Each structure stands twice: as structure tokens, then as C-alpha cells.
A protein has these predicted regions:
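Terminal amphipathic alpha-helical/low-complexity segments used for targeting or macromolecular assembly
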Residues: 1-200, 205-206
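Short, conserved interaction/coordination micro-motifs, predominantly
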Residues: 209
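Flexible, glycine/small-residue-enriched loop-and-beta-strand segment within the central core
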Residues: 213-222, 227-337
């Protein structure tokens, strides 16, 4: 199976969260869309020009700009995929368990067509010809080479049953994460790589969890190589990524996901920390998204609640330089911190 994940014109509305990474590489739940799609087959990214230049120069490197594993640089589909079903996925699709199951169902059914969300292509199933000819192959090549869905839009494709959730604004990342994390952890547990060492705590081989750790509710999933110090309080659902370290006396609260090699201390709630970021000291980080290569100093406190307890408005600068106020409808919303901040 060949998978093409593409960024459309609305990806810039996600703001600083996707300024230095593809939208498909945002961690939501315990996984990014790219990593979730990798279980379906060979994944190619179609990204904005500045990211495409970075990907093109990754030969020989182990880690991407955004802290993920180096992607395959192959531009042609694997030989086995010629003359087979292929799927195109919008990079703004939320990698929730329901969405991933829907995409898997589309692939297994193999019916040619599209799934749209308010008129926007969320996914399309194409039939690639064995000789590389035909309209589907032309649309595939056009999208891969130019990033434009124009040719894809001209195809006569039936509307397929099902729906897929898309990210629209920065705060959607937090909302989607809170809704997706439990199902995302369930998909990890289904792999059988995690053993339950105490009620609600699931630990991979090679991880280290001190005896004095308290798990008040699960599931808490700890990946290989992670380390959790003594006197830590864990409230699930939560994910501790590979090589991450939780310092003694920390409180990791529900809906928190720590990416690979993160360092965490103090109190963290309903927050995503992308790989290689640090908040190792006391302080509070809540309902936030922290990009890769970010270091939050000792005592850092993020406010996630208005003094009035009312809904939070988000003031955002758009790509054209204009400003817009977004009514998030959320009572709790913290910091949106991009990569390298």
C-alpha cells in the first residue's frame, strides 16, 4: 500500500505549531498522523516548500528538524504498489483511533472515491495503474510533485461513506488530543509490547519506573528507555515516550503525552511535549502544546484559565500579516509553543 499525505492551503492556520514541521508530524494522543499511517504502508509527505527543501537534504541524517525519525526519501511508489490501491490523506486529519480505523477500512474496501469534510478532501482512494498511466496516476503524480490537489479535484470520484476529523485552528490540537489519547493508548497496548506492572501502569521492556511511583488512574503507558523517578504521581490517560525522563516528585496529570527524550518535572496537565523538549523543574504547564527543541526554565508557569473563568479567545497572526481573534469556546487553554522557541 502506498500512502501520500499532503498539506493543503489551510495548514498555515495552525500557526507556530506547524511553522517548522509538517502538520502530519504533530503528536496528538500518543502518535503523529505520519507514524500512524506508516502501519498502512509506505508513506510519502507532500509539504510546504521550506520543509520540502529540508526533507530533500536529510540523506545521512538520523533526526529531522522537528525531532522525528528521518523519513524515506523515495519519491516513486514501491514496485509492488503499481497497479494497486493507494490512498491520499490530508495532513490535518486527526490521528485518533476512529480516524485511523476509518482510513484502514477505506484501504481494505478499496473502493475508488473521496471522503470530504465540509467540502475539503480529507482522504481519497485511487487505483494506480500497473503501467503508470491513467487519470488516477496523473492526479497522484501531480499532487506529489506540485502539492496541488487541482488534478485530484477533476477526477470523477464517488463520495465514500464515513467521516474524518480535521484540525482547523491551533486550539483544535489540544481538543483533539484530549479526545484521542485514550484510544491512541489502546492502539499501543494492542501491540502487546507493554506489560502491566501495577494497576493502570503499562511498561515496555527497557523502561525504568521507581517503586515509589503512584498511579492514581490509568492507563499510563511508558515506552522503552523511559525513566520515572521516585515519588511521582501519575494520572492517566498519559503517555511517556521512549527515552523520556520524569524527575522525582513530578505530577503528570491526565491527557499528558511526553515525546521521545523529553525531560519533565513539576506539574503537567493535558499537554503535548514534542520530542527533545525540556521542562525538568518545578512549575506548571497545562493544556499546552510544546514543540521540539524547547527548554522551559525553572519555575515556568503557564496560565490556562482566565480570571473570569470564561471562554478563552486566541489572538493570531495570519500568513498575510493580518490579525484575527478566534473564539475557542474552551475554558482551559495554555501556551502554543513552536519548535525551537
Amino acid at each position: 500500500m502506498n500512502v501520500l499525505v499532503f498539506e493543503d492551503s489551510r495548514v498555515d492556520r495552525l500557526g507556530v505549531l506547524t511553522a517548522a514541521r509538517p502538520a502530519c508530524d504533530l503528536m496528538i494522543g500518543a502518535s503523529s498522523l505520519h507514524d500512524a499511517l506508516a502501519h498502512l504502508g509506505h508513506v510519502q509527505r507532500v509539504v510546504r516548500p521550506h520543509l520540502a527543501r529540508h526533507i530533500a537534504g536529510l540523506a545521512g541524517r538520523r533526526i529531522t528538524l522537528w525531532g522525528g525519525a528521518t523519513p524515506s526519501l523515495t519519491t516513486e511508489p514501491p514496485a509492488s504498489s503499481h497497479g494497486a490501491t493507494a490512498i491520499v490523506v490530508n495532513a490535518r486529519v486527526v490521528p485518533s483511533r476512529r480516524n485511523i480505523q476509518s482510513l484502514r477500512s477505506l484501504v481494505e474496501t478499496g473502493h475508488r472515491g473521496t471522503v470530504r469534510e465540509h467540502g475539503t478532501i480529507a482522504a481519497a482512494v485511487l487505483h494506480l495503474s500497473a503501467d503508470g498511466s491513467g487519470p488516477d496516476h496523473a492526479a497522484w503524480n501531480s499532487l506529489r510533485d506540485t502539492g496541488s490537489t487541482a488534478t485530484l479535484e477533476t477526477l470523477e470520484l464517488m463520495e465514500l461513506d464515513g467521516s474524518l476529523d480535521l484540525l482547523h485552528e491551533p486550539h483544535d490540537v489540544i481538543t483533539a488530543h484530549e479526545e484521542a489519547i485514550e484510544g491512541s493508548l489502546a492502539m499501543l497496548l494492542d501491540t502487546g509490547r507493554f506489560g502491566e506492572t501495577k494497576p493502570g501502569l503499562f511498561v515496555a521492556d527497557g523502561a525504568s519506573v521507581a517503586d515509589q511511583v503512584v498511579v492514581r488512574q490509568g492507563p499510563v503507558v511508558v515506552a522503552a528507555g523511559a525513566e520515572i523517578g521516585p515519588f511521582v504521581c501519575l494520572d492517566g490517560p498519559a503517555f511517556i515516550g521512549s527515552g523520556a525522563r520524569v524527575n522525582p516528585h513530578a505530577w503528570i496529570r491526565a491527557a499528558t503525552a511526553l515525546g521521545m527524550a523529553c525531560r519533565a518535572g513539576g506539574e503537567i496537565e493535558a499537554t503535548i511535549m514534542e520530542p527533545f523538549s525540556n521542562k525538568p523543574h518545578d512549575g506548571f504547564l497545562g493544556h499546552s502544546h510544546v514543540g521540539s527543541w524547547v527548554n522551559l526554565a525553572a519555575g515556568t508557569i503557564t496560565s490556562n484559565l482566565k480570571a473570569t473563568y470564561g471562554p478563552i479567545r486566541l489572538h493570531m497572526m495570519l500568513p498575510d500579516g493580518s490579525r484575527e481573534t478566534i473564539h475557542t469556546g474552551r475554558q482551559f487553554l495554555g501556551a502554543m509553543i513552536g519548535d525551537f522557541a
